[in-house]
């Protein structure tokens, strides 16, 4: 996976967000401000606050979107931009339930879901065809590589709701209650989706084990 690009979004007002690293005169003060305070500042139109939030969280948001949507880096970067611009617009709605990162994760998950619906694109197909297994028993390294490849393919084939539950809980290590809040579902619904996702992935790995 390509590294997240640090292209800072421009807020709807048209003023360029200035990354934290460029705000020498405010670096110390911004570094000491909590995420919640920065988000509140976004809510009253402070572009520097959004720049600081972007610097703190863009890598995590990029990683999450990359796991939810297998796409070209430029497309993923566009969705990251959309996520932070929506955070700028939605900042006044933050009610303090959960962390600011989970707030951003929720926006990112919705952005990906809307992307699926609006574009109606199919998942990008993997290039190339896996080579057939050798006639002799493969060594442990080869078997492990094949299992990882099957897991990656199976994760892409999961319905979006199941994949989102698995990514948030098992890859991002979010607590169940927080992951449910991010996805806007009840805890029971989250656990059902996570159970189905884990079972599907386990079957994909075990079903192809030599």
Which residues does each predicted region cover?
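Structural recognition of an alpha-helix C-terminal capping motif at a helix-to-coil junction
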Residues: 78-85, 98-110
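Conserved RNAP core-binding helix
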Residues: 38, 62, 73-90, 172
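Base-recognition residues in the alpha-helical recognition helix of bacterial helix-turn-helix
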Residues: 55, 63, 67, 85-89, ...
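Arg/Lys-rich amphipathic alpha helix in sigma70-family domain 2
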Residues: 89-96, 106-127, 144
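Residue-level signal for the short linker/turn that defines the boundary of a DNA-recognition helix
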Residues: 48, 71, 88, 98, ...
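Intrinsic, short, N-terminal disordered tails of RNA polymerase sigma-factor systems
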Residues: 1-44, 48, 52-56, 120-187, ...
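Amphipathic, Lys/Arg- and hydrophobic-enriched alpha-helical face
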Residues: 54-73, 90, 155, 207
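A short, glycine- and basic residue-enriched loop/turn
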Residues: 68, 77, 91-97, 101, ...
């Amino acid at each position: 996976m390509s590294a997240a690009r640090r292209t800072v979004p421009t807020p709807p007002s048209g003023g360029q967000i200035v990354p934290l690293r460029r705000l020498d005169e405010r670096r110390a003060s911004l570094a000491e401000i909590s995420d919640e305070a920065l988000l509140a500042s976004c809510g009253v139109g402070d572009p520097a606050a959004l720049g600081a939030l972007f610097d703190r969280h863009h890598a995590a948001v990029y990683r999450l979107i990359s796991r939810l949507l297998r796409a070209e880096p430029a497309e993923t970067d566009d969705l990251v931009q959309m996520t932070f611009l929506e955070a700028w617009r939605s900042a006044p709605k933050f009610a303090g339930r959960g962390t600011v990162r989970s707030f951003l994760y929720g926006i990112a998950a919705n952005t990906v879901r809307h992307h699926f619906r609006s574009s109606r694109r199919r998942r990008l197909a993997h290039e190339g065809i896996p080579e057939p297994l050798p006639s002799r028993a493969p060594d442990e390294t080869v078997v492990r590589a094949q299992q990882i490849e099957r897991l990656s393919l199976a994760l892409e084939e999961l319905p979006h709701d199941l994949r989102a539950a698995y990514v948030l809980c098992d890859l991002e290590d979010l607590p169940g209650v927080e992951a449910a809040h991010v996805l806007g579902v009840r805890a029971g619904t989250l656990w059902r989706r996570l159970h189905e996702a884990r079972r599907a992935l386990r079957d994909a790995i075990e079903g192809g084990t030599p």
